[in-house]
């Protein structure tokens, strides 16, 4: 037993005092922060031009051509939309420049942001997927490749190790969306749903490992998105069209079984993020509920200014969902709608700027960030872009 005034008791009291101070200090820092930059990883949902930068100039991908980028930028930028993406609206909210792509950039300034997200990227390594008969032509840039590019580029981005750690500590690190293409490519080669489900824990472990590595490098705040409700995807609604009406949600017209798959991914990802949060209490790990942020637009399209056919693509080529497999937006045989701001879906796979703006608002101002961001030390909110031509 320790008695009053004894050295053991004094040491115990000092330890308790310091422990309380440390916990309090960490908690106050993670409530509201002024981010100095954005570091982004992921796929086409966050790609601001990386796939374009990696492409052969003689064989450019379809999003390198109009009508991609026609609103806001007024020319293609390598983004898979008619305008800005969620990451762009986050940057605007934080008062930061739009995050430049890393790959193919020349003399770009990455001091306030750098983006490694590549259209078509997977969480798992290409060789791992190909060994399981899952082949894809788009890119060999996995999450691991992106992370390695980031580590190798640090001396040129931020200089000394101490400066780099400071940059990473004060950055909002956007981890995706990533993993959706792992599932997409498996569906595209007709893998069964049970076999595709086996990829889920592997995808989530890969995301978790990347977050853990970035925490070791100084990462303090992570925004980790879940998947879209793929049962509402124009591509999947077209490729998995069925006469069995019981497979469709009567309110939205989305495929219930595919949406359940997306929900399962989100549940497993959130459980893993909760585990990481307990392991690293000094870090702020925020789940971005892309699933419900987008699904809400399908549930009540008129409320958000969309037309009453939200499952129809703006840039498409006929059919019940204005989408034909193999006929891509950005080619001469596909036309764009007159007013993309009235559409949720852009090209059958990706969303319009109008949809992305609303999703960003739901993440930044609630209710689709878990736990929610605390902006009490800030005076500004998401800027309403109004017209997508502004």
Swiss-Prot record:
<feature type="signal peptide">
    <location>
        <begin position="1"/>
        <end position="28"/>
    </location>
</feature>
<feature type="glycosylation site" description="N-linked (GlcNAc...) asparagine">
    <location>
        <position position="140"/>
    </location>
</feature>
<keyword id="KW-0442">Lipid degradation</keyword>
<feature type="glycosylation site" description="N-linked (GlcNAc...) asparagine">
    <location>
        <position position="322"/>
    </location>
</feature>
<feature type="active site">
    <location>
        <position position="350"/>
    </location>
</feature>
<keyword id="KW-0964">Secreted</keyword>
<keyword id="KW-0325">Glycoprotein</keyword>
<dbReference type="InterPro" id="IPR001087">
    <property type="entry name" value="GDSL"/>
</dbReference>
<keyword id="KW-0443">Lipid metabolism</keyword>
<keyword id="KW-0378">Hydrolase</keyword>
<feature type="active site" description="Nucleophile">
    <location>
        <position position="44"/>
    </location>
</feature>
<protein>
    <recommendedName>
        <fullName>GDSL esterase/lipase At1g28580</fullName>
        <ecNumber>3.1.1.-</ecNumber>
    </recommendedName>
</protein>
<dbReference type="InterPro" id="IPR036514">
    <property type="entry name" value="SGNH_hydro_sf"/>
</dbReference>
<dbReference type="GO" id="GO:0016788">
    <property type="term" value="F:hydrolase activity, acting on ester bonds"/>
</dbReference>
<dbReference type="Pfam" id="PF00657">
    <property type="entry name" value="Lipase_GDSL"/>
</dbReference>
<comment type="similarity">
    <text>Belongs to the 'GDSL' lipolytic enzyme family.</text>
</comment>
<dbReference type="GO" id="GO:0005576">
    <property type="term" value="C:extracellular region"/>
</dbReference>
<dbReference type="GO" id="GO:0016042">
    <property type="term" value="P:lipid catabolic process"/>
</dbReference>
<keyword id="KW-0732">Signal</keyword>
<dbReference type="GO" id="GO:0000325">
    <property type="term" value="C:plant-type vacuole"/>
</dbReference>
<feature type="active site">
    <location>
        <position position="347"/>
    </location>
</feature>
<dbReference type="InterPro" id="IPR035669">
    <property type="entry name" value="SGNH_plant_lipase-like"/>
</dbReference>
């Amino acid at each position: 037993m320790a008695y009053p005034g004894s050295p053991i008791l004094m040491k115990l009291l000092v330890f308790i005092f310091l422990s309380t101070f440390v916990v309090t200090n960490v908690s106050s820092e993670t409530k509201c922060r002024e981010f100095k930059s954005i570091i982004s990883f992921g796929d086409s949902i966050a790609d601001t031009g990386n796939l374009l930068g990696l492409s052969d100039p003689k064989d450019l991908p379809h999003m390198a051509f109009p009508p991609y980028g026609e609103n806001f930028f007024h020319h293609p930028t390598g983004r898979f939309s008619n305008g800005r993406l969620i990451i762009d609206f986050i940057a605007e909210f934080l008062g930061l420049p739009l995050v430049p792509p890393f790959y193919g950039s020349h003399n770009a300034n990455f001091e306030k942001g750098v983006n490694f997200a590549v259209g078509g990227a997977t969480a798992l390594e290409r060789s791992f997927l190909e060994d399981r008969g899952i082949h894809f032509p788009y890119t060999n840039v996995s999450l691991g490749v992106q992370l390695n590019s980031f580590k190798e580029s640090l001396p040129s981005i931020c200089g000394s190790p101490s400066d780099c750690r400071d940059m990473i500590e004060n950055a909002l690190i956007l981890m995706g969306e990533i993993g959706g293409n792992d599932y997409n490519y498996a569906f595209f080669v007709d893998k069964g749903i049970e076999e595709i489900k086996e990829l889920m824990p592997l995808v989530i472990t890969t995301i978790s490992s990347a977050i853990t590595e970035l925490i070791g490098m100084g990462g303090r705040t992570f925004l980790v998105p879940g998947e879209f409700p793929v049962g509402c995807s124009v591509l999947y609604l077209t490729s998995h069209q069925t006469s069995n009406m019981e497979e469709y949600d009567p309110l939205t017209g989305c495929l219930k079984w595919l949406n359940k798959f997306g929900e399962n991914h989100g549940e497993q990802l959130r459980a893993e993020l909760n585990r990481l949060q307990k392991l690293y209490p000094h870090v702020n790990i925020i789940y971005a509920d892309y699933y419900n942020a987008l699904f809400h637009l399908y549930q009540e399209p008129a409320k958000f200014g969309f037309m009453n056919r939200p499952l129809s693509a703006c840039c498409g080529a006929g059919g019940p969902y204005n989408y034909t497999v193999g006929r891509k937006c950005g080619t001469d045989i596909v036309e764009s709608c007159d007013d993309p701001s009235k559409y949720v879906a852009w090209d059958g796979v990706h969303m319009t700027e109008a949809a992305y703006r609303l999703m960003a608002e739901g993440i930044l101002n609630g209710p689709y960030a878990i736990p929610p961001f605390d902006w009490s030390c800030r005076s500004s909110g998401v800027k309403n872009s109004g017209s997508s031509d502004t």
